Amino acid sequence: MTVTTSYRRVATSTLNGVACSANSNCITVTVNDLTPGSIAADQTICSGGDPAGFTSVAATGSGTITYQWQSSTTGCNGTFSNIAGATLATYDVPSGLTVTTSYRRVATSTLNGVAVQLNCITVTVNNLTPGSIAADQTICSGGDPAGFTSVAATGSGTITYQWQSSTTGCNGTFSNIAGATLATYDVPSGLTVTTSYRRVATSTLNGVACSA
């Protein structure tokens, strides 16, 4: 049923060919026509980042509409919990999110308390652990540093590397080393200037690149 409809019963008594009719009381089935609206699409952010505020289309219905946002860290088919204070048509997730989280909005009409859940959207967190590289070395001028051993980076997406160097110390300005894009790096022999090195790891997931 999609339309509010009233009903009554007509009773007829027939005696000696004479039909007499009477109507019962009238009852009404009220249809609470609640349309949930919609909320914004999935997002991917770097760990600890700030998701964009969720845009939405407001719900419409026969009564007064109220909202409650819910979240789940076990996916759209997982268990959802109410987010305290999140009772507007839109919602802005606080910055600092470190766990992939799904969200949905529940719209409720005060007319007979009908509630409708919206589509679920997911904020995917692109986590990245940068790994580590070998310890400091001291060489003679013009010598050949030992190749830098390392622990590989791990992340949610595809991992790429870029080695950088600085002749002004670890707090100085670093520049990319051309072609140095592997997990390890071997400095060419002949180094005559004290040089600092670091490896930048990047995890790319859903077109979002996160570096450490």
Regions found by a protein language model. Name each.
Residues 59-71, 153-165:
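Solvent-exposed loop segments of extracellular immunoglobulin-like
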Residues 47-59, 141-153:
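A short beta-strand segment in extracellular, disulfide-stabilized domains
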Residues 33-42, 127-136:
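Proline-enriched interdomain boundary motifs that mark the N-terminal boundary
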Residues 71-95, 167-188:
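Surface-exposed, flexible coil segments in extracellular/virion-facing regions
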Residues 6-12, 68-70, 102-108, 162-164, ...:
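Extracellular recognition modules
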Residues 12-20, 108-114, 202-210:
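Short, solvent-exposed loop/turn segments at the edges of extracellular beta-sandwich modules
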Residues 1-4, 95-100, 189-194:
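Surface-exposed, short loops/turns at beta-strand junctions within beta-sandwich domains
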Residues 27-33, 121-127:
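Interdomain boundary/hinge segments at the C-termini of tandem beta-sandwich modules
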